Amino acid sequence: MKTLKNDWKLGAAVGTALSLGSAGAIAGPHGFDLHNVFHGASASFAGTSIAHVEDPVSAVFGNPATLTTYYGGTNFMFGATFYMPRATMKHDGSAGHAVANTGGAFTTMNETAQGSAAASFNFDATSKADVYAVPTVAVTQDLSGLGIPVVLGVGVSATSGIGVDYKHSSNSLGAAAELINLGVNAGIGMKMSDTMDVGISMTITYAMLEAGLTGSGGMTHDLGFRGTLGVRNKISDATTVALYYQTEQEHQYDNLHVTSMHGTQPFAALSSYSAAHGKTGSVVCNADVVTSNTGVCRQDVEVEQPWNVGLGISHNMDANTLVMLDITHKAWSDSKFFKEFYDDQNVISVGIQKTMGNLKLRAGYGYADDPLLSMVKVGDEIKTIGLVNSEGNATSSPMYGLFMSYFQAMETPVIYKHRVAVGLGVESFLGVPFLSLDTHAAIQLEEDKCFGSGQADYGTGLGAYSATTKGIALAGGLASDGCTSADHTKATVSSFHLGGALTWSF
């Protein structure tokens, strides 16, 4: 991602305030959900863990049916992964131009624009959100000794996250946003027969969202809940198949987003914004002292993580060789807010493990669809935005296709397609028979994407307010950067992570 003047301000404010942060932090092949890609041994398998697990954290936060792996005693795991993303964004100035130079026509400003050329709002920057520590803690306990034939698992870890930091750029207006979802999981797994296991778990997330843009946003937190059901069946001595389902997870961030800097009816005087689109209507306004044209309005923002369904297979090729395959479907199109930017996503991952004495050599690969919609429409969950532009003027604007497209570009870390991972497991670590070590290192290969040209066919018949604001470049485009003259933004992302964990088995 990058920084920009007004441009960024507008798009980013929308993004940060609204979106659980925005691009750059803990993102990967599952959008910004983690799905065991940072956890214990599963991180070595690119997250592959639906049918078989090699560590307690992956059982607690993955398919709860795999908790039955830990019948017999107590297992405690403690570790961390350090994630290092790199996100850069180049923008031609379209968004900043739209916020600064269209007052009275498409946006509301109390001051006359300085008339800066559209291209003067361009930027090319690298996010400073470049290192994250992800904790992994879990314990499993066999309750058979109490006459209860189940395994209980509890744990704490980050379940999703994303973020950007462009405060170092003078054109960013202090743009920075961060979302961290810290999950507390509790689950039980039970053997139903010699071949079938079932499990159920509950996730309670403490979500923290900070939107650090001038005039728009702050830090808000919320609690969310998600349930997971899982089953696995051993179809032969060597092969196990498994299935799990996760519900949606909802968070509501109270008074997070600024909808207007100019009261409840900020667009009544705009010459290029029609009554049919809300020119004379009132914006959402959580405020106690406002009039139709003065005062700052805010709104609550409701965001849903998608429901997921996953299928996994594990197979022991011989006594020392294990291979695994996972397929996960993420229903972004049913998720409030994110359905405006994402389509459904499919993720495939494979893992292999070779045991050599007390050593376990591991490798994994993951591939994911790019979930970003090729065309976005005007904002629905967030219909308007209020901010302070790069010239210091309070601005209010409808969420045009241009701003939605710009915000989508801020989420670019979700376009990762390829993850490659390796790892090492050591049983009886340091000669201690009840202690094991899991380590991993992984990269997400560089991807880039251009934004703007996909909006070319977004006409008034599809809901666009005007040809000017539908989302194509207004400041020359990025044809010289491998995009087209209709693209306003190009984003490039890559990442690396490594980590380790110790497990005590009693």
Go through the PLM ranges and name each one.
Residues 4-6, 13, 36, 52, ...:
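Hydrophobic alpha-helical segments and their boundary regions
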Residues 4-6, 101, 109-114, 277-279, ...:
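Surface-exposed charge patches in extracellular/virion surface proteins
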Residues 14-15, 19, 100-102, 107, ...:
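Short stretches within intrinsically disordered, low-complexity N-terminal or propeptide regions
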Residues 1-27:
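Gram-negative bacterial Sec-dependent N-terminal signal peptides
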Residues 22-146, 369:
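N-terminal, post-signal peptide beta-strand-biased segments of exported outer-membrane/organellar beta-barrel
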Residues 2-4, 8, 58-61, 178:
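Solvent-exposed, charged interface segments at domain starts and junctions
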Residues 28-38, 42-46, 50, 134, ...:
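Outer-membrane beta-barrel porins/channels
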